[in-house]
Amino acid sequence: MPRKGHTQKRDVLADPIYNNKVVTKLINNIMLDGKRGVAQKIVYGAFDRVAAKTERPAIEVFEEAMNNIMPVLEVKARRIGGATYQVPIEVKPDRRQALALRWMTTFSRARGEKTMEERLANEILDAANNTGASVKRKEDMHKMAEANKAFAHYRF
């Protein structure tokens, strides 16, 4: 417990093109070494590719992909009487979004396409179609929670 109280959550500004805070968070996640311009070019380029491939608004496809990636349950280690149990807990909405964005960027970087723009676009498309590494990660997390359902009564 901090003595001075909790810090306030800073709100991000909505991005100028899509007027969406989640897109800004994606840009911040993609950004390396403070190069926001490069990150914006990657994200907006990827969104253009997504719109061209699906013939739907890119933001719509992105939101669908985010919904498919966001985890509902996760496991947290809890030590009780010398044994460590993996206790399933519900994921808070802010953390859900943060995890989904983190997985999307991590697995985009790990892909084999030539440019980051292509990688991100294809990861978004895969996630929207319920395939891809980030969706698999969410499903693995849910399987872990399901397997450890017996320890749910040790909740925090």
Swiss-Prot record:
Domain of life: Bacteria
One of the record's GO molecular function terms: structural constituent of ribosome
GO biological process: translation
Pfam families according to UniProt: Ribosomal_S7
InterPro entries according to UniProt: Ribosomal_uS7, Ribosomal_uS7_bac/org-type, Ribosomal_uS7_CS, Ribosomal_uS7_dom, Ribosomal_uS7_dom_sf
GO cellular component annotations of the record: small ribosomal subunit
Gene3D superfamilies: Ribosomal protein S7 domain (1.10.455.10)
Keywords assigned: Ribonucleoprotein, Ribosomal protein, RNA-binding, rRNA-binding, tRNA-binding
Annotated SUPFAM superfamilies: Ribosomal protein S7 (SSF47973)
Free-text function comment from the UniProt entry: One of the primary rRNA binding proteins, it binds directly to 16S rRNA where it nucleates assembly of the head domain of the 30S subunit. Is located at the subunit interface close to the decoding center, probably blocks exit of the E-site tRNA.
Summary of subunit composition and partner proteins: Part of the 30S ribosomal subunit. Contacts proteins S9 and S11.
Family assignment from sequence similarity: Belongs to the universal ribosomal protein uS7 family.
PANTHER family linked: RIBOSOMAL PROTEIN S7 (PTHR11205)
Protein name, per record: Small ribosomal subunit protein uS7
